[in-house]
Amino acid sequence: MSKLQGTGKTRLAMALVAVVVILAVGVYLNSMQKPSESRQAKTSDADAANPNTPEKNPAKSADGNIELVASYKADVSGNNAWCAPLQICWDQMRNTTNAGQALEPTADAPTEGRSLADALNAGTFETTRLSDALWYSYAGPMNAEARRQIEEAIAQKFNQKSDILDKLNWQSANENMLLFYAMLYHTFSFEHPFALSPEKGGFGEDPEANVSYFGTEDAPDDQRRDLLAQVTPLYYSSSDDCACTVKTKEGDLLVLVKKPKGSSFSEIWTNAMAAAQTGDHRPLSNKEDFSCPKLDVDILTTYRALEGLTFDVTDGRKLKIAQAMQTLKMTLDNEGGSVKSEAAITAELTSLDPQGLRTFRFDDSFALFLVDGKATGNVTGDGSLSSDAQPYLALLVNDAKLWQTD
């Protein structure tokens, strides 16, 4: 762990919002409906999330705010968001400290922390589904050099500054403290900007929700064909059970699912993709419409349930999480959108207990065998001893002085 590691591997770009950020928002596909009839849903109160106070989790769905969940497989309800950086950090921590194996909390771990760790262990994120241009990560010692490396990397790659590094406890970092950091940043645009609705509308069961929309309903007739061509239906059972994609200029796909089914984003995605297999993919006609709420969220979440968790990792060491947090800034409007998310996990990796260290000191009776490593069947492919090996020399030593001439 003496070497700093900044990573960001060249990968295939996939559907940005579908894979990286998923928000439970509504999409309206309808045939000649009035705006007031098609715009119904539950508002996401982004303003209630406090992005500046890591002392508490500002995102509690039950309180009407937006909850930034830690794992793609975590339970969701109400208003939730998920983005990949925290999972990337967790996966790096597994790979660095526990040979890629699941991080299992010790027996005294609180139930909430254990549940969150289980969800992160189950939610491994495939960075092969992200292009290199979208993300950066670091795994290594937590020190001034690490901070300098991260700040220079994200400035060069994204022209961005960190919103999270100042919130980490650098003063208490010692030689055993590790930092796992990731940033995802991307902007996308629609080749043909959608029309902004001149009036705000309802959402869900609240006709007075005062929600801003964009789409095709208020677009001039000569622009509708190009706007509708950006929208591809995935399935349509009714105006309350439908899904579509919206293509961006950069090739990303915005995936929108109305009345999503499932208890986690993972289940919602799986169910939507299953429905899309047999769905109605006919292009929208000039008499059909699309509309979507504008989105603007800025969230900082500190995962207190993870902090203090201790894990038994490889080589008899222990790993204890000190801090775990994530940010999400996302916008979506008629012209396109942006996503910026950072996550960091700091953890102390303790050395072996001296009493638990193994000592191979042959200072009493011992046997010695010599095996030809080049002969067939004596060693395995990685050079280790085969169970079928045949030694060509064997010694049994009970008095080492007899075996020495000086």
Q: What residue ranges belong to the model's regions?
A:
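Initiator methionine at the very start of the polypeptide chain
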Residues: 1-2, 62
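Hydrophobic membrane-insertion alpha-helices, especially the h-region
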Residues: 15-26
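Hydrophobic-core positions in well-structured secondary-structure elements of globular domains
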Residues: 50-406
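Ser/Thr/Pro/Gly-rich low-complexity linker/stalk segments immediately outside membranes or between
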Residues: 32-50
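N-terminal Sec-pathway targeting helices
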Residues: 5-17
